[in-house]
């Protein structure tokens, strides 16, 4: 029964209503006991004493008729003579609980204040307690001697119509309150159920069907953020599918090539061709190994929570090491590398930053024309570190420029790279809270600019 949010809210609300009614009854009873009981006692005592004055001025034979008249006026009366004989007028009492000591005191001319002195009972309202000790009493003088007269208003008779009205009112109040609780609970739960169904659609892979934002409260905010999450998950799913397709293509193509080369290797006995096939297979497997390494690095960057960025890096020395490592490739194309480096320290991940800067230099060497030049600069600028690397080469179209940092994107179909280098570089720079930009001048000079926050101090 409590497994659904609808049942929980409805039952909790109904419980609150009933508990509030109970507490209200108890507090009302407390209020009567401490604020109204004494004044109620005094009013009834005043009425009884006025009745005694009237009877003392009237004929004594009329006293019984007078008590009957008071009984007809919605009072309950009990009289006791000195012999202990009791006579009741009006509606009967529910129970005779009056003590003999109280009777004797009244017969001895001591007034009795049973209403005021009624002990407090938590769940019994003294005002409605129809027993003989919940009365006021005084002594009446008659021809036959003193009698003790005890009286209280007949609440049941006095408020009979009001009691019916009150009962109907309470029943309607509870019915309407519970109905409204159930209806309001349903109005709250309904969009939550729709969210549940939408979540189930997400689990099944449906990222296209939105949910309508029907409210402006917290649930409406939840609906809005759910749609945003759905769109993000849809984009992630598309990226995942695209990534799988690209990886499959990047692996399938060289594997197909290797399979073809192995077939040719089996069929030929020419030593020169065989050596050429072996060299080609070695080159392709090297590319596959590089692809695997970069895919693992991408996975590491996507799940970067374990990475530390607290290495103290001497950036200028790091760049010099990268240049020295790639100098052979530059010399093969007769390239000149010009470096203007300020001495700068930086806190980050040295392994990753080395990879990012190496990718940029390798790209520059690869796309710079033979005999060209590569310019590298490192400098402070306010609170930032600025690294630029420029080279002249073939122009890049605006369409290609917009997709330059996408995974597996290649500017040329004849490019033998796997299209991951710049994507890896961008991820590394962003993990260091930096930015990377690409610009191209009219003279076909391409420049990559990296901006890093200088928080080394």
From Swiss-Prot:
Pfam families according to UniProt: HAMP, HATPase_c, HisKA
Transmembrane segments: 9-29, 164-184
Species whose genome carries this gene: Staphylococcus aureus (strain MRSA252)
Modification(s) after translation: Autophosphorylated.
The protein's name in its UniProt record: Heme sensor protein HssS
Family matches, as InterPro entries: Bact_Sensor_His_Kinase (IPR050398), HAMP_dom (IPR003660), HATPase_C_sf (IPR036890), His_kinase_dom (IPR005467), HisK_dim/P_dom (IPR003661), HisK_dim/P_sf (IPR036097), Sig_transdc_His_kin-like_C (IPR004358)
Residue stretches making up the Histidine kinase domain: 246-456
Catalyzed reactions: ATP + protein L-histidine = ADP + protein N-phospho-L-histidine
